């Protein structure tokens, strides 16, 4: 049997002692990450009944699950990921890469061609542990999420995206400030203490060409 690395052993110990893991299990959520979105929503009021939401990098589905509960039967939640994801009540799942035209059009069809109210992206690359590699990869995914948001968001729409500070960060924030009426940076309590992640929340979408 292969030996566990010190880092994987530390992760397991942290995971099983994590209060948010326990709470997610108690409340029937698929991941502890749901509490990050919950806190962002409480602060920024992202969802309302009837809201249309796209969740990028959705698997295993915690964020989509929470969003579906918030938008209700009159809303729509589309979960998109390259990984397979088990079905969830009130959530339409599309598997694939949204850079693929066929996948993008399947996504638009799933939401009835309507403009989107909220785009969520908790996407992250497979982490190598090397910040000089991981941060640029994360920024690339964030850029892709922003590009998609600009294609699908309706007026006054909202955008939530995971970022890691480093190369390209300030330029990204500047781009967001041009596209949204308000931009805030959030570090949810549910983010692990050792994580450098931060969330950008843009509200009041006003278009890409301002």
Curated annotation (Swiss-Prot):
GO terms for cellular component: cytoplasm. Gene3D superfamilies: Vaccinia Virus protein VP39. It catalyses: uridine(2552) in 23S rRNA + S-adenosyl-L-methionine = 2'-O-methyluridine(2552) in 23S rRNA + S-adenosyl-L-homocysteine + H(+). GO terms for molecular function: rRNA (uridine-2'-O-)-methyltransferase activity. S-adenosyl-L-methionine binds at residues 61, 63, 81, 97, 122. Keywords: Cytoplasm, Methyltransferase, rRNA processing, S-adenosyl-L-methionine, Transferase. It is found in: Cytoplasm. Pfam families: FtsJ (PF01728). Disulfide bonds: none annotated. Its EC number is 2.1.1.166. The active site is at residue 162. Specifically methylates the uridine in position 2552 of 23S rRNA at the 2'-O position of the ribose in the fully assembled 50S ribosomal subunit. Belongs to the class I-like SAM-binding methyltransferase superfamily. RNA methyltransferase RlmE family. This is Ribosomal RNA large subunit methyltransferase E. It comes from Methylococcus capsulatus (strain ATCC 33009 / NCIMB 11132 / Bath).
């Amino acid at each position: 049997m292969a030996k566990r690395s010190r880092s994987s052993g530390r992760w397991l110990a942290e995971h099983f002692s994590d209060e948010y893991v326990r709470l997610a299990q108690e409340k029937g959520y698929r991941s502890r990450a749901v509490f990050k979105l919950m806190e962002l929503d409480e602060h920024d009021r992202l969802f309302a009944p009837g809201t249309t939401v796209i969740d990028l990098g959705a698997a295993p589905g915690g964020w989509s699950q929470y969003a579906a509960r918030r938008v209700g039967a009159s809303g729509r939640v589309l979960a998109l990921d390259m990984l397979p994801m088990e079905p969830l009540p009130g959530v339409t799942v599309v598997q694939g890469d949204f850079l693929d035209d066929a996948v993008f059009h399947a996504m638009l069809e799933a939401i009835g061609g309507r403009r989107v109210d909220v785009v969520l992206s908790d996407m992250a690359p497979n982490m190598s542990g090397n910040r000089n590699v991981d941060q640029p990869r994360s920024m690339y995914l964030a850029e892709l999420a922003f590009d998609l948001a600009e294609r699908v968001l309706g007026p006054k729409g909202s955008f939530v995206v995971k970022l890691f500070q480093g190369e390209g960060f300030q330029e990204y924030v500047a781009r967001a400030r041009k596209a949204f009426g308000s931009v805030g940076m959030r570090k949810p309590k549910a983010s692990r203490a050792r994580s450098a992640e931060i969330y950008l929340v843009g509200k009041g979408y006003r278009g890409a060409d301002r």
